Every structure is written in C-alpha cells, then in structure tokens.
C-alpha cells in the first residue's frame, strides 16, 4: 500500500496512489484512504464476482398473461383484480421504457392503482407478489400513520425513505420501485364537501400525497423523521414509481346502489347479501370514491381501479393448501425439520376457514388460527423423539380436543397440555 501522504504532505489513495488533487473525492477510514475511482472499480469487481443483476430489464417486462399466471401461484381467486393489475403494471414499465428511449414524441402518463376489497382479501399480497415478479424495490406504508407536514405524525416523504432503504439506498433503482399504501380509505374526508377546518390526518394527507403520486423531485431525510435546516437530503424523482393504494372502503356498495337508483327490499340470506355487495363493488367508478370522501385531485391520480371479492370458505381452504407458500405446506415443513409428519384432516381445514370468516379477518387471520391450534404441538414435539406423526382433526380445529400424536409403534395419543 501507498503512504497516506507524499513528500508535499498531500493526502493520497492507499490503493492507487493518486493524490487528493487528482481525484474527485478521497474517503478516509481508520488509518487508510480510498478514492472514488477505486471505490467504483471495487463495486464492478464485486458485481462481476457475485453476478449481481439489475433489478429489472425494462425492455423485457413480463406480458400481462405471464404476470397473471405467476400471481396465481401465490394468490387464490381474485381473477378480475389480477387481470387489471397485470395490465396496469405491464403498461407502467412499458411507459418507463418508452419515455427513457424517447423514440416517440408522445409522453405516456402514469397509471397508479387503487385496490378496493375487504380485509384479508389479498390486496397487500398482490402488491408484494408483483414487486417480487418484477424484482423491483418495494415498500409498504399505512395511511393512518401519515399526517401532512408540520403536524405530529409521519411525513409522506418517509414512505419514499422506506423504498430507498429497500433498494439499499440506490436512488436510481428506488425510482423504478413500487409503493403500496394500505388503509387509504381511512384518510377519506368526513363529507364530500371541502373541509373548512384542518383535517390533518384525512384530506390533509390526500393533499400531501398528490405531488408524489403524480411525479415530483422529493427531498427525503436519510434517517427519517422531520426535516431540519442544514440536513443533507436525498433527492428522488417519483415520476416512475408505481403507487398502489388499497382499502376496504366499507359502505361504498351503498353509494354504488344509490348512484344506480336501486333499492333492496326485504331480507336475504348472508350469502345473497355477500354476492349482491360483490356485484356492486365491481361497479365502483371514480364518482363513488368522491362520494366516499376522496378528493377529486387524488382520484385523478388513481386511474386504475381494481376490486377484490370477499373470500368464501372454499377459497380460504384453497389458500391454506394450494399456493407455493401455503400455510399448511409451511407448517408441514416446520415439523418435518423435527422428523415429524403433519396431517390436517380435510374437515379440519374447513373448520379453520369457517373460523376466519366468523372473525371477519379473511386470509389474514388464518395463520393466527393455526398458531393457536399448533401451540402445544410445537412446544412438545422438539423435546420428544418417539413421535412420528401429528394429526389435526376437525375437533382439534374447533378447540374441542388437542391434536393427536402418533408414536413409533403406531399408537395414537392425545397431546398432554402443559400449564
């Protein structure tokens, strides 16, 4: 290695020997210096060695049918929403490619997406899976934690910081990522008329989100929190970031009914009401979102609206068993690591699905239900070497008995609960 400074007392790179006057930047470490050129060379060598690829080749974005097919590996049902998302995402990244090559004088505008569907219907999972398919940075934010600048709460710029962190602070990659904002219906204003008083967690948040949804160069504090004078800020262009917002929008079906001038007479079964609500939900238009409490400018920046249906019993059973990362497969694998086979009786899966529907948690609540059933099993099995199989029966799923354990000699015993 070279000395830290030459005869004239100038600092120099410990690797290539260039002085600080010969390079753009010299970074100091404990007893060592490295120049920007050597840093760049090191990065190239590491990328070559590890085979690090770019996040996504925008010239080869998967076709809508391919995107929907991959989504179906992880998300059960919701075909209408998957189609809408596949088309919107394909067009979004095709637009980025078109605007970057500048072959056409027509500049394509951005199509952010609004997902409307009940809790646990798969809104977040769809957004996460899209990001995984495209291998782009992804961040999730909760709209209820946001407030407009100057008030106690989280600034909207902190959403962008999460995306930058997801891209390992590579701003260029973050600028082509996906941000999912959940619970967007919770920032609807209380009435469709503009508010006279400040609504800092409702209409104020919508106003604050407008610029980043449309596309602007935002200044983001690198450590999060509020901006301070003399603080170095990260500049990020949001023009190519795809924003997906989601919410349950409870009660929007009634708004659609009123718009269509339809009245429901009499009392139907729960199933009939569910089907009826889903029919109206699929007919949501921007005018209905305005009535619900989103401001016109905000709705204008969400041109793609996709609706998701409430998951029924059959769909929840499929979610438990069919996807690549299905919960039943995960728990089977966990017990497999202890050399124990796990079996769920078909009727037990139906009971788990019924419980999720009763709790009104949809697919989101399935894991907590299984955790509750499996608690004693997962506590006991690691300490035993005579168990070969665990059976979850219908009664065990209902909480009426403990799961059954099969021993090496083939005998079946109930698990003993410990205090």
Curated annotation (Swiss-Prot):
Signal peptide (from-to): none
Family annotation (NCBIfam families): clpX (TIGR00382), PRK05342.1 (NF003745)
Keyword Nucleotide-binding: yes
Task of the protein: ATP-dependent specificity component of the Clp protease. It directs the protease to specific substrates. Can perform chaperone functions in the absence of ClpP.
InterPro entries in UniProt: AAA+_ATPase (IPR003593), ATP-dep_Clp_protease_ClpX (IPR050052), ATPase_AAA_core (IPR003959), Clp_ATPase_C (IPR019489), Clp_protease_ATP-bd_su_ClpX (IPR004487), ClpX_bact (IPR046425), P-loop_NTPase (IPR027417), Znf_CppX_C4 (IPR010603)
Coiled-coil intervals, chain numbering: none
Assembly and oligomerization: Component of the ClpX-ClpP complex. Forms a hexameric ring that, in the presence of ATP, binds to fourteen ClpP subunits assembled into a disk-like structure with a central cavity, resembling the structure of eukaryotic proteasomes.
Ranges where the ClpX-type ZB domain occurs: 1-54
Family per record: Belongs to the ClpX chaperone family.
Pfam families xref list: AAA_2 (PF07724), ClpB_D2-small (PF10431), zf-C4_ClpX (PF06689)
Gene Ontology BP terms: cell division; proteolysis involved in protein catabolic process
Binding site for ATP: 118-125
Chain positions recorded as Zn(2+) binding sites: 13, 16, 35, 38
Molecular function (Gene Ontology), one example: unfolded protein binding
Organism per entry: Listeria innocua serovar 6a (strain ATCC BAA-680 / CLIP 11262)
Protein name: ATP-dependent Clp protease ATP-binding subunit ClpX
Keywords: ATP-binding, Chaperone, Metal-binding, Nucleotide-binding, Zinc
GO cellular component labels: HslUV protease complex
Gene name of this polypeptide: clpX
């Amino acid at each position: 290695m070279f000395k830290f400074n030459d005869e004239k007392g100038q600092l120099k790179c410990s690797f290539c020997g260039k002085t600080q006057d010969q390079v753009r930047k010299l970074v100091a470490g404990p007893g060592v210096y490295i120049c920007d050129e050597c840093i760049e060379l090191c990065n190239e060598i590491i990328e070559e060695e590890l085979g690090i690829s770019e996040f996504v080749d925008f010239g080869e974005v998967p076709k809508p049918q391919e995107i929907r097919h991959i989504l179906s590996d992880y998300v059960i049902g919701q075909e209408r929403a998957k189609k809408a998302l596949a088309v919107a995402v394909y067009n979004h990244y095709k637009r980025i490619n078109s605007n970057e090559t500048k072959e056409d004088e027509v500049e394509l505008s951005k199509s952010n997406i609004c997902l409307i569907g009940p809790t646990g219907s798969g809104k977040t999972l769809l957004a996460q899976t899209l990001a995984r398919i495209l291998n782009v940075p992804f961040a999730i934010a909760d709209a209820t934690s946001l407030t407009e600048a100057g008030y106690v709460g989280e600034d909207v710029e902190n959403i962008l910081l999460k995306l930058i962190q997801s891209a390992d602070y590579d701003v260029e990659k973050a600028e082509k990522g996906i941000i999912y904002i959940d619970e967007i219906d919770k920032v609807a204003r209380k009435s469709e008329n503009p508010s006279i008083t400040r609504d800092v967690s409702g209409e104020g948040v919508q106003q604050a989100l407008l610029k980043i949804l449309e596309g602007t160069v935002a200044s983001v504090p690198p450590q999060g929190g509020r901006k301070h004078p003399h603080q170095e800020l990260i500049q990020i262009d949001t023009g190519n970031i795809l924003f997906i917002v989601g919410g349950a929008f409870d009660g929007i079906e009634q708004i659609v009914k009123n718009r269509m001038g339809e009245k429901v007479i009499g009392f139907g079964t729960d199933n009939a009401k569910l089907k009826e609500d889903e029919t109206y939900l699929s007919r949501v238009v921007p005018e209905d979102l305005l009535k619900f409490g989103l401001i016109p400018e905000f709705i204008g920046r969400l041109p793609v609206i996709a609706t998701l249906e409430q998951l029924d019993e059959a769909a929840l059973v499929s979610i438990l068993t069919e996807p690549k990362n299905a919960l039943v497969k995960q728990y089977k694998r966990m017990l497999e690591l202890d050399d124990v086979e796990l079996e769920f009786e078909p009727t037990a899966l139906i009971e788990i699905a019924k419980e999720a529907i009763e709790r009104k948690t949809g697919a989101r609540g399935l894991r907590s239900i299984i955790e509750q059933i499996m608690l004693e099993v997962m506590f006991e099995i690691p300490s035993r070497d005579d168990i070969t199989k665990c059976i979850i029966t219908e009664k065990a799923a209902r909480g009426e008995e403990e799961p059954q354990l099969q021993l090496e000699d083939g005998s079946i015993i109930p698990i003993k609960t410990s205090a």
